[in-house]
Structure formats: structure tokens, C-alpha cells
Amino acid sequence: MNAAIRQRLAEAAKDVQMREILTFLYRDHPQGAPFEGLKEMLFLHDNFEEARLQQLVEDKILIFDGTRYKIAVTARQVLDRDPVILMEEFLR
């Protein structure tokens, strides 16, 4: 399962804005943040849709508690062991 989560994290991180969201939630806001807050704090493009985050919830990368998105425990464990997944250099 961790291999699948690691692979999904790596796939999601290929998108610059998704990588910014994941890094922000992992490193800066482990308590989570609402979608509108993420859009405002990270200056996401207006056409960035919340459905993309919902897909990561379905993939068990994020948790949504009704108001805020957070990194899921299993995804956090993968990132704790291998944080380079979120580094741009790793993705090249």
C-alpha cells in the first residue's frame, strides 16, 4: 500500500500547483487548511478546481474533515521517510 501511495504522491507532485499544496500541507500547515484558504495563500490559478483535491482524498493522500484538507497519516509516513518526492529536482 505504501508503494501505491508513494507512486500517487509522485504523480500528483508532477503538477506544480498540486506540489505546492502538498508541500504546504505537509510542512507548513499540518493542521490542514480549507480550499479557499489554499487558493488565497498559494495564489492558485482561478481555474484550479477543488475536485482535484477530492481525487486525492479518494486516493487516501489527503483527508477532508468537512472544512479542511490535511495530509493523510499514511501519506505523511511516506513523506517522512522520503520527502524528496515533493522536490522539483526529483521529478525531472
Task: Identify the role of each PLM range.
Residues 12, 26-31:
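Short helix-capping/hinge SLiMs at alpha-helix to coil transitions
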Residues 57-68:
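A short, conserved structural fragment
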Residues 17, 29-30, 46, 60-61:
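Short alpha-helix boundary/capping elements
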